[in-house]
Curated annotation (Swiss-Prot):
Name of this protein: tRNA pseudouridine synthase A
Swiss-Prot/TrEMBL keywords: Isomerase, tRNA processing
GO biological process: tRNA pseudouridine synthesis
Similarity comment: Belongs to the tRNA pseudouridine synthase TruA family.
Transmembrane segments: none
Catalytic activity field: uridine(38/39/40) in tRNA = pseudouridine(38/39/40) in tRNA
A Pfam family hit: PseudoU_synth_1
Function: Formation of pseudouridine at positions 38, 39 and 40 in the anticodon stem and loop of transfer RNAs.
Residue numbers binding substrate: Y110
Subunit description: Homodimer.
E.C. number(s) listed in UniProt: 5.4.99.12
Alphabetized InterPro entries for the sequence: PsdUridine_synth_cat_dom_sf, PsdUridine_synth_TruA, PsdUridine_synth_TruA_a/b_dom, PsdUridine_synth_TruA_C, TruA/RsuA/RluB/E/F_N
């Protein structure tokens, strides 16, 4: 038995998230079903983290153990031939038995795309949050730094049974783009690319942080409310959770 690490890309639009569920199509279950066809037995995979319904991934990581009777290159080709077009294995590699896709993680990074034009192309609406309202970009930029460092992110997480909600955000940036390139096409427009890197994330944390920044840019939330939320542990009253379609798990760092 060898421990095999997979790096995976997927478009999460048509899935109920990463984790296998009793009802609903998931990324994990889809990959496991294809592995079952190849190895003729049940194969369970472990992911580096769960992505919610509609969230995409550029570099999700998962592992599985199997008796390998073919090269990794051939396995990757066979697996990709069985997978639907919105899931792709981009790399397979052998790793030590001690490697764990969750416990061995040092950092993760996410990207979030927002389009703030009055109109947004139908070809990318499944990958961006279309928000056609005027935003104070300088105030949003100022607010980003308030989220970096080691803090208790209780106020910015979803309902979860995770007891320790202290996380260290190493980097949180926003970049203005006048062109967004997906696949083989580039579309002109006004976009914001948020990127956040941390030692770990709570459920809905990235989407809540982006939603908070947008509310500040819209003038619906005072910038002082961020520190107040950290101190009280209570969610800002006007904060919204950004929709899932603009969110990408960028990479997992070990």
């Amino acid at each position: 038995m060898v421990n095999i690490k997979m790096t995976i890309q997927y478009d999460g639009t048509n899935y109920f998230g990463w984790q296998r569920q009793r009802k609903g199509r998931t990324i994990q279950a889809t990959i496991e079903e294809c592995l079952r066809k190849i190895f003729q037995r049940e194969i369970k995979i472990r992911g580096a983290g769960r992505t919610d319904a509609g969230v995409h991934a550029l570099g999700q990581v998962a592992t599985f153990k199997a008796e390998l009777k073919m090269s990794l290159d051939i396995l990757k080709k066979v697996l990709n031939s069985l997978l639907p077009n919105d899931i792709k294995i981009i790399k397979l590699e052998n790793v030590e038995d001690s490697f764990h896709p969750q416990h061995s993680v040092k950092r993760k990074s996410y990207i979030y795309y927002l389009c703030f034009d009055e109109e947004c192309s139908c070809f990318i609406q499944r990958y961006v949050w279309h928000y056609p309202w005027k935003l104070d970009l300088s105030l949003m930029e100022e607010a980003l730094s308030l989220f970096t460092g080691t803090k208790d992110f209780t106020a910015f997480s979803g309902s979860t049974d995770v007891k320790n909600k202290i996380r260290t955000v190493h980097d949180f940036t926003m970049q203005l783009l006048t062109k967004l390139c997906f696949m083989d096409m580039c579309l002109n427009g006004n976009f914001i690319k948020f990127r956040i890197e941390a030692d770990g994330f709570l459920r809905y944390m990235v989407r809540n942080l982006v939603g908070c920044i947008i509310e500040i840019g819209k003038g619906k939330l005072r910038i002082e409310s961020i520190q107040e939320a950290f101190e009280s542990g209570k969610r800002p009253s006007t904060m919204q959770t950004a929709p899932s379609n603009g969110l990408f798990l960028e990479k997992v760092i070990y």
